[in-house]
Amino acid sequence: GVTGLANAAEMCGHPYASKGFNEFTEKVMTELRDHCYSASCDLAREKGSFPLYDEYQYLQSKFVKTLSPWVQDKIKECGIRNSHLTSIAPTGTISLTADNVSSGIEPPYSLYYDRTIQQFDGHTVQRVEDYAYTQGVSSRTANEISAKEHLEVLALVSKYVDSAVSKTCNVGNNVNYQEFKELYTQAWELGCKGITTFRAAGKRYGILNEVVEGDTPKAEACFIDPATGQKECD
């Protein structure tokens, strides 16, 4: 899987869910998928394929047919060690160990927010800043992205993953039941492997909560033009 995807793309000048972002994501996911399968072929050459492997049935599967031709040829030659290889995990906590890069395929929840940490003696609240913002790059945050755009990114990544994808689709506080229902129907129609929605005005106090008051992080926010590399700073 991946983490930090949104930060990486936006530091190359591609705002989340834009055409450039989607093209960047497809390149990343193609490389990830193909080389995961290639590595599993190398293991199969050494240790054998997984017990239920049937070459004909496996190579006829819809997902395997999307692999690059050189990977399919390698499977024919070597077999494959693992039945499943790719997923997009919920990496919110893991990403904190890398200075709070954007988690998984998610956009930053906010440029800075309060994170609730449960402990034996209660809980504490920590102020957390988005990594890209501290490096001077202005990112689109989760609540600035429409539910439709969230869903498009989810559907795009799902094509390259053979198991599950963790992706939250943020919906507005005024979303009605029919709109909410249609989001799940569209996810199914697009072939998504699951969908999670989040409405900030829910009854439960969230683990992550956007800060609406207080000082702005001390970083100059810039947009990077991917064609020229020039920065336009606020």
Segments and roles (model prediction):
Residues 14-91, 183:
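Internal maturation/activation junctions in enzymes
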